[in-house]
A protein has these predicted regions:
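Ubiquitin-like/PB1-type beta-grasp interaction modules and other compact soluble beta-rich domains
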Residues: 1-96
Length: 96
């Protein structure tokens, strides 16, 4: 098992247990767990996720988590273009 820290932003918090909303929390993960696996295991549908950062770097859903990773998970962006940062899909969820 490895331990990673997670933080979900904006409306993604609606999918989380109340004690995890709006704050960073630690979670144990299977040794080969991917970002997608853990996001969904925490109750957030991956289809609602636009950007995942692990230790400040944009990653795809296939990124295997390591002990001590800090995972930030973001929903659709409305105010600015994040296309150059995306690693979880080919184009933004929301088109301007």
């Amino acid at each position: 098992m490895v331990s990673a820290r997670f933080r979900f932003y904006e409306e993604l918090n609606d999918f989380l247990a109340p004690q995890h909303r709006g704050r960073e929390f630690s979670r144990s993960c299977a040794r080969a767990a991917t970002t997608k696996h853990m996001i969904e295991a925490l109750g957030v549908p991956h289809t609602e996720v636009e950007l995942v950062l692990v230790n400040g770097e944009s990653v795809g859903f296939d990124r295997i988590l390591h002990d001590g990773d800090r995972v930030s998970v973001y929903p659709k962006f409305e105010a600015f273009d994040v296309a150059p940062l995306l690693r979880v899909r080919d184009r933004p969820l929301r088109e301007s």
